[in-house]
Amino acid sequence: MESPRLIWIPTGVASSNLRYLAGHETAHQWFYGLVGDDQATEPFTDEAVADFVARNVLGLKRASRCSTGRLDLSIYSYSATCYYEVIYIQGGNLLDTARQQMGSTAFWAALKGWADANRYRIATTKSLLDALDAATPIDLGKTLFAPRFPRLY
């Protein structure tokens, strides 16, 4: 669970998950603590980014166990079974696809620029996607984001 400057990991967590959980919750220090969002209506903005950063740093890859879903819905719109799979895993994988298509240098520069521009503010998913899209000549909005975020495109 994220909280500024503090990571909460409950007892009983499998030791094989500790590295990922510590990485994910540390990423929340930037993507929730530094750049806020509306976690209920736009969970992608911090959960998918935190998942992506943790998995990227640790070199972890994972496919989702749920069918491909929309990433622009509120937490209340997903089943309990697929919320984590869609928002965290599919969302993180979508960001990794954006990184691969843009190139790592452009991706990380865009993410840093977005974080700097939204420091201590409430950011939106659309502002994040727009920052990534603006950092590449590839039309990510049309080719990658629109199918998963129809409410925003």
Across the structure, where does each feature detected by a protein language model lie?
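Juxtacatalytic substrate-recognition/specificity segment
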Residues: 1-42, 60-62
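Secretory-pathway/luminal and periplasmic proteins that interact with or process carbohydrate-rich
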Residues: 1-3, 58-63, 118-124, 153
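Post-HExxH zinc-binding segment in Zn-dependent metallohydrolases
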Residues: 4-7, 12, 41-74, 138-144
